[in-house]
């Protein structure tokens, strides 16, 4: 059963969030507020947010990524003082990115709640360093496990580090706003949340610190789309399209084998272990690929849903506007 929540019944419908950062990280934090019903206003400089120029660009020059990040938001051009703009004065929360903050402004200049996003945090030895998604991937150690076994690590493309940073900024600022509401009349003054993109991304590799502390060897790079301990894992071709597969526990493995008619693999006792399956990838994967090639991605996806298998159908550009889950969202 699916229901649509009216905007005035959404959890954040009475919040005004103002984004003056204009980066992927600040925009993603604002996007999550907008998704939950908040009124989000982009206070943009005369040249517009930097996200407006991120490729790919549509025929009319619009950035597809910008459109995704800023759906259901309002944009206002600010040519005068940011601090005295009516949106800032009325805001429940101002989201900013230190990397795009004008030199004439400081984080402490605002008299309202602030979520200050930065690459490395507002304090510490890296605070003044310039950052990038690639540098975050390198510093967290994420790149160590990506790439061919006999080659250099591969730098992930896209803006994954900033998206995770924006998600963390959203979670943290929601907590502060909730604390203000619960405190009632006794609440303290405005807060400033120091949201470090680097710190947020440590969630991906913090287990490595524990392994190092216990003198355990770091996992070796296993090759393209090989990440211990999960297998099968990857985006694979089907008869007519591609399917994302993430199978970990024994019940998922049994259901996946049933879906593809590979019952003998499901019955193999040692393959109840995901790591054992990964060790025998040379035996298992050719059979999986052959079975996938005999079915459509759409058919496998919907049948797999009913069997509680973690599958993701990869739509073509032509299908994006007709995929049911996207239409509903």
Which residues make up each language-model segment?
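Glycine-rich beta-alpha junction loops
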Residues: 47, 119-121, 197-204, 240, ...
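A glycine-rich dinucleotide-binding beta-alpha-beta segment and adjacent secondary-structure elements
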Residues: 298, 305-329
